Amino acid sequence: MLSPKRTKYRKAHKGRIHGLAKGGTTLNFGAFGLKALEPERVTARQIEASRRAITRAMKRAGRVWIRIFPDLPVSTKPAEVRMGSGKGSPEYWVARVKPGRILFEIEGVPPELARQALALGAAKLPIKTKFVTRIGEA
């Protein structure tokens, strides 16, 4: 699963996801992509599950690019622990995704297979998404 090799700080604030994506909104690598339509935190597990579903649907033909990276640690406290006594330890990593962000890109497969593969990948994600194509494709 994806996670940073090293970070400046061990724990991070929760924060909020405001506004639309500034960068990463256009297809840069592949011919087809999956675009986020709502703000959400996507975990490394969800990204990996989606990637596996896409590559399996493509029967390992073509190429897949992951355009988001989980760089935010999420900390949790153990079950049945009283409030207070500090913040919990980091448990997993998430990527903050804003609307308009391209999540995955693929190429090297027919348009109908690309649509089907990205639909299977989108089912593994906690957000509404949209299938996008490069101008002139399909």
UniProtKB/Swiss-Prot annotation:
Signal peptide: none
A GO biological-process term: translation
Keyword field contains rRNA-binding: yes
Keyword entries, A-Z: Ribonucleoprotein, Ribosomal protein, RNA-binding, rRNA-binding, tRNA-binding
Presence of keyword Ribosomal protein: yes
GO molecular function: rRNA binding; structural constituent of ribosome; tRNA binding
Gene3D superfamilies linked: Ribosomal protein L10e/L16
GO cellular component, one term: cytosolic large ribosomal subunit
CDD domains: Ribosomal_L16_L10e
Function: Binds 23S rRNA and is also seen to make contacts with the A and possibly P site tRNAs.
Quaternary data: Part of the 50S ribosomal subunit.
Family under the similarity heading: Belongs to the universal ribosomal protein uL16 family.
Protein's UniProt name: Large ribosomal subunit protein uL16
Lineage, top ranks: Bacteria, Pseudomonadati, Pseudomonadota, Alphaproteobacteria, Acetobacterales
